[in-house]
Amino acid sequence: MASKVRKVTSRQKKNVKEKDTVKIEETEFDPSLLPLPASSTKQATQRLYRELRLIVHKQDTPSNDLGFYVKLDQLHSIYQWVVQLKNFDPSIPLAQDMARHNVESIELEVRFAPDYPNLPPYIRVLRPRLLRFMNGGGGHVTAGGSVCMELLTLGNSHDRGWYPEYTMEAVLLQVKLALSSLNPPARLDYDWKRDYNAREAMDGYIRSANLHGWVIPPHWTTLFKR
């Protein structure tokens, strides 16, 4: 995996904190109607309701281009999202690969533990398959498709890692920024049509986090390996 994604500045940290004062207009989408997993908690559920409603409100506003889209038709739990990253800078190699193969977006799965927001979200690429780091690829995506960067871990004695104040909008933008990095650039794999699976994604996350000495959140291997 490439070097760490650039740190969030103090000004950016202020911008990624929850914006409870934002007025959300009523829409047909009501996240409270979604079923909850047995391990859900009140704290995580309320935070996720708020986060998701803010994102849906913005993505339903034509003037807003978030650069990503939460697929509501595939949202079967507030604790598990499918997100499309789109509208990459057309000059970067990843965007050029995508255009060449008529790939419209990078599709992610985002999963949340019952300890969220005290623990970070777990994010992995579903499709398309990206070129491995050992073969010249980049973008902070492991060989198994998981996104592994300091922001999505508990850090270590030198790196702070996750902050509970981070919003999911800011996190997804950071993931897109990492995929847009040119050092080295993310590229589509030769076998790009083959989807990643959950087991290889978690195995890749563990290997990469251990390599950097980052602390893996507890219970992730049992929660997200399937």
Model feature map: region roles:
Residues 108:
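Extended lipid/amphipathic-ligand handling interfaces
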Residues 1-104, 115-226:
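UBC/E2-like fold recognition across ubiquitin and ubiquitin-like conjugation systems
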